């Protein structure tokens, strides 16, 4: 994806989901912000990490949150993670003639943890781990090498942080800290910020 840069990753393990993204918002060579949160909680057991245009990230996070809330109130039941990912794909696809320029890793749990990757026009692909953005090739190299299905949630957090650090070290459009969203299976999501120097 050309344009604004970023690195966002997602990892699924048996104990939950980890989503992480760096905090730099840049356009070309200009850094507009060093504190742009590109990781979003969605409901009480889902979230997304994004790369692309910051306003588009915020718009799809709000739209998806509202649609899920409406569904859950109307139907008196929780929306499945796969259904929420498909809904996000429909939101993106409905704008295909004027796309929302955001690549997204979406994850959460219902009967099991799940991760989905979406492109700006709504393609939905289920994965065990993934990276998006300008730093994705660097992050994926580490994820491909180090990911194991039997990892603990803590090991997945460390791998997500390290993969974003590696990408930020070489991708000038990524940097300035990492936001990490941890969604433990059966638990509540939590976000923390990690320094790139840590």
Curated annotation (Swiss-Prot):
It is found in: Cytoplasm. Residues 1-6 form a propeptide. The keyword Hydrolase applies. It comes from the Archaea. Its EC number is 3.4.25.1. SUPFAM superfamilies: N-terminal nucleophile aminohydrolases (Ntn hydrolases). It holds the Pfam family Proteasome. This is Proteasome subunit beta 1.
């Amino acid at each position: 994806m050309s344009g604004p840069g970023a690195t966002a990753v997602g990892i699924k393990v048996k104990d939950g989901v980890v989503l992480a993204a760096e905090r730099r918002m840049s356009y070309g060579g200009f850094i507009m912000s060093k504190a742009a949160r590109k990781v979003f909680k969605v409901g009480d057991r889902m979230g997304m990490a994004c790369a692309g245009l910051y306003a588009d990230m915020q718009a799809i996070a709000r739209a998806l949150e509202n649609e899920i809330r409406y569904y859950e109130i109307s139907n008196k039941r929780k929306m499945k993670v796969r259904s929420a990912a498909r809904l996000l794909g429909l939101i993106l696809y409905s704008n295909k003639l004027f796309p929302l320029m955001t690549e997204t890793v979406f994850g959460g749990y219902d009967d099991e943890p799940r991760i989905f990757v979406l492109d700006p026009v709504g393609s939905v692909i289920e994965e065990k781990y993934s990276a998006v953005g300008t730093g994705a090739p660097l992050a994926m190299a580490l994820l491909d090498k180090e990911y194991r299905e039997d990892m603990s949630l803590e090991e997945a957090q460390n791998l997500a942080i390290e993969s974003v650090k590696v990408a930020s070290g070489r991708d000038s459009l990524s940097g300035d800290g990492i936001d990490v969203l941890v969604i433990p299976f059966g638990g509540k999501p939590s976000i923390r910020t990690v320094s790139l120097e840590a």
